[in-house]
Design a protein with these regions (language model features):
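Extended low-complexity, serine/threonine- and proline-enriched intrinsically disordered segments
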Residues: 86-115
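Positively charged n-region of N-terminal signal peptides that target proteins for export
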Residues: 1-5
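Bacterial N-terminal signal peptides
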Residues: 6-14
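Non-catalytic, beta-strand-enriched accessory regions in extracellular/secretory proteins
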Residues: 40-66, 72, 78-81, 91-92, ...
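N-terminal signal peptide c-region/cleavage motif recognized by signal peptidases
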Residues: 16-18
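Extended, solvent-exposed segments with strong compositional bias
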Residues: 51, 110-146
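A mature extracytoplasmic/lumenal domain signature
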Residues: 68, 77-81, 158-160, 172
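C-terminal edge strands of extracellular/lumenal beta-sandwich accessory domains
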Residues: 22-34, 62, 90-100, 134-210
Length: 210
């Protein structure tokens, strides 16, 4: 089919765009703790996990491994650009060995032998993702230097315990391959559904979970 080469070129152009494209995954609540965290295979490789915060699934956990001390960890926390989420400000934390011990209470237990670095929402930058045709607000964007090698976690949650939607991105090096061409339409449809692209506005800000 003639459309296939054109599609391949369009996808390649999207991946190579300055805005970049993260390889997506979608959470249905299965990544809610350290024992069932989403596995980040390589912290340099660009991935994103989309997650809906509910009263039953209040956290998103990702597990990573730092190959050496001093390794940089690039992370982003975003919120879909949906009217009811305009003031939604979740929080991100990196939990890993060598980080400072916790100085406050968290809605989850810090694994033994690990410290924590909290990355609170301090910005609200509009972001258009051409790969999926979606729009978001980026509320956290940091490169954190990991003081020790070994396993660690990235945790996202809403400090006010309100339902909402968020995504967490890790890494900056795109690693799309030929096989990903076959997944593109499914990824795009799922991302647009998550961002409620084309959907009618629904309600106002949600109340905190009891």
């Amino acid at each position: 089919m003639r459309i296939w080469p054109a599609f391949a070129l369009a996808l390649a152009a999207s991946v190579a765009s300055p805005a970049g494209a993260h390889k997506p995954s979608f959470s249905n609540g299965q990544y809610g703790g350290p024992d069932r965290a989403y596995p980040v295979q390589n912290i340099d490789h660009s991935i994103v996990v989309y997650h809906e915060i509910t009263c039953d699934d209040r956290q998103l956990w990702l597990r990573f491994s730092a190959p050496e001390a001093g390794k940089g960890l690039f992370v982003q926390l975003g919120v879909p650009k949906i009217d009811r989420l305009e003031r939604y400000r979740p929080t991100l934390a990196v939990v890993a060995p060598g980080l400072p011990p916790p100085q406050r209470q968290f809605p989850f237990a810090i694994p033994v032998g690990m410290g924590v670095e909290v990355l609170s929402a301090e910005i609200s930058r509009a972001f258009h993702e051409p790969f999926t045709g979606t729009d978001s607000w980026i509320v956290v964007e940091r490169t954190l230097t990991l003081p020790s090698s070994g396993s660690g976690y990235i945790v996202a949650w809403d400090p006010d315990a309100r339902p909402g939607k968020l995504w967490v991105a890790v890494g900056e090096k795109e690693t799309f391959g030929a096989a990903d061409l076959f997944r593109f339409f499914g990824w795009r449809a799922s991302a647009q559904a998550f961002h409620e692209v084309g959907a009618a506005p629904t309600g106002g800000p949600t109340a905190s979970c009891a």
